A protein has these predicted regions:
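Conserved hydrophobic/aromatic beta-strand scaffold that supports enzyme active sites
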Residues: 29-33, 142, 190
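Short amphipathic alpha-helices and their capping loops
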Residues: 1-21, 44-90, 95, 110, ...
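Active-site-proximal acidic secondary-structure segment that organizes catalysis
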Residues: 3-5, 9, 117-169
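Acyl activation and transfer enzymes in specialized metabolism, enriched
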Residues: 35-58, 128-145
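Short catalytic/binding micro-motifs of nucleotide second-messenger systems
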Residues: 58, 99-106
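Short amphipathic alpha-helical segments
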Residues: 26-32, 79-82, 131
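A general secondary-structure signal for short beta-strands and their flanking turns/coil
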Residues: 25-27, 109, 123
């Protein structure tokens, strides 16, 4: 199993996670509603195709022998998704809230979940939940779009399912190349020169202070 360092954006999120440990501050969550009778077998296939083609959703975190946080990519293994039944919008909102406010066990466990649900009418959808260390709000939107595109392709029996594999390892490698390049040294020199004198911090007056000054 190959271990990789966190990228610089991930390190920032990891520090936030440590400060707000045990909370859902880094949980990104969204719901996809399908305005039609849902074929959940096909939806499961579409989700598994997405997971196979996007290794960032197979990232797991661990601590190495020195206690440093590392990441690794779990091999793809087809997943089974249980479908939850909801009676109405209130139950759906409660389910969304429960999922969105539940923190991840960030070391060792999967950093995402996808929860299909069915409404009494036969319509339904799925709730996507991911840790910010592997995704952002834009990613969540792309996840929904890719899964639904694949879902429609399978339903329509398209001969070719347009699914383009992407790898976070490419980004890790590109960041490492930059950090070991002359360009990085040049950029570092520039910014160190810019901040030889640390600028004063800007302060936003509180509402209480503003009210006191105006009275």
């Amino acid at each position: 199993m190959e271990l990789y360092d966190l990228t610089n954006p991930q390190k920032s999120i990891w520090l936030t996670e440590q400060f707000y440990r045990g909370t859902s501050i880094n949980v990104i969550c969204g719901t996809v509603l399908i305005d039609d009778i849902v074929n959940f077998d096909v939806l499961s296939k579409a989700i598994n195709i997405f997971l196979k083609d996007n290794d960032s959703f197979r990232i797991k975190l661990c601590l190495d022998e020195n206690g440093e946080v590392k990441q690794f990519f779990q091999d793809f293994c087809e997943k089974h998704f249980d479908v939850l039944n909801v009676s109405n919008n209130i139950e759906l909102k409660n389910l969304e809230k429960e999922i969105a406010t539940s923190p991840f066990n960030i070391l060792g466990d999967a950093l995402f979940s996808i929860t299909p649900f069915q409404i009494l009418t036969g319509k339904g959808g799925f709730i996507v939940k991911a840790h910010h260390i592997i995704a952002d709000a834009c990613t969540a939107s792309l996840v929904a779009s890719k899964i639904m595109t694949t879902y429609s392709s399978i339903l329509n029996e398209d001969e070719e399912i347009k699914s383009i594999p992407t790898s976070y390892i490419n980004y890790i490698n590109s960041e490492n190349e930059y950090l070991n390049s002359p360009k990085f040294e040049k950029d570092k020199e520039y910014w160190e020169e810019q901040f030889q004198t640390v600028p004063e911090f800007g302060v936003i007056p509180s509402l209480i202070e503003s009210s006191a000054e105006s009275s």
